[in-house]
Amino acid sequence: MCKAVIMAGGEGKRLRPITCTLPKPMVPLLNKPVIDYCIELLKKHGVEDITATLHYLPNVIMRHCGDGGKYGVKLSYSIEDAPLGTAGSVRKAVGADARRTIVISGDAMTDADLTEAMCFHKARGAAVTIVLKRVSVPTEYGVAMTDSKGRIYRFLEKPMLSEVFSDLANTGIYILEPEVIERIPEGEKYDFSKDLFPALLKEKMPVYGYVTDRYWCDIGDIAQYKAAQRDMLDGRCAFTTAAKQKDGAWIEDGAVISESAELLGPCYIGSGAEVSEAVVSDYSVVGSGARIGRGSSLKRTVLMENTRVRENAELRGAILCEGAEVESGASIYSGTVIGSGSRVGKNCTVCNGASLWPEKELREDEDCTENLQWEEDTPKPGIMSRIRGYCDRTMTPERAVRIGAAFARSSGRLPLEIAVSTDGSQQGV
């Protein structure tokens, strides 16, 4: 049996403000984090010993995934204090384990046939097999050229348009023999595409490319994030879901939907969501615990967990992150992301492409035409101010300790003991 490493340390800067409070592998697709689909895919193909490499907001992933028991796998973690690169992080995660290793990116959606890829790897006697996918725009990925037997003889990471020599893109799924992993320097920043693969090709090592015809989408930016969910609702990707399909709408148990609501599929409604006399249509996704008020209309919109859309609001191509609120009469248009815990006031308009970073607020009747970010009005808390955020995200243990230390210093009487406590809820004020 082989083991697997999920590369899950990505920060996902191009997905901000979604990833301001979520690590990239925790971004939800149809109400379930991307990393869940990765673990389920590995389990499906018989790989049950998994290590996830973590760096950005690691506690969010560990709290959600636990020890892997809920997936039927054994899941451990390798946390990087400083980024080690793709290969360096895998080297740290594998350690002295001498088994063949499957590496998979924790921020891509795929139903690739890993069993078939493994058979290909063994039959070729490969030191490394890279799973490849034909794409129309290869400049965003590493590209490879293979001979008739699949052996890679040319590889280039993210070529310029003038440098493109192939449409075979690197999916970030690798099968590695132990001797290859041993070549990766320990404790150093080292990359598969920029360092390891070029070195192996230079030495004429047997590096092969398995071309998959299954679905694969890198969740690299907002457009790809939306596209992946459209593709899933269109049936282009095989995946497991708790929802049942009815008249084009996917509905999880526990959703509360008014008899007067219009669900014009394809769309997805998560457990515990409440939909009043509203319209949800055109690939919209409503996460668990989200609530939609009477007279509101959603098209091509994603509501993450515990969001609130009040009466007569209009959302077109928007994304609401966890805990965001939209008041009555507000209008939010295409390309907009409302960050975690943010609030769009009554009768406000958020124009195309403008976004609110977490914990921002638009007051009644305001228009937003550009991004409202943290830097624009950094809060300066006074004695009566409050600090608000999600545990392990904006409210990390380190930040809580710094807050306690700041209170102690400001008292003017040292030594002084300050207690930092929690009531166990996810959101703290």
Predicted feature residues:
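Glycine-rich hexapeptide-repeat left-handed beta-helix
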Residues: V279, R294-I387, C391-D392
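An N-terminal, well-structured beta->alpha segment
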Residues: D377-Q427
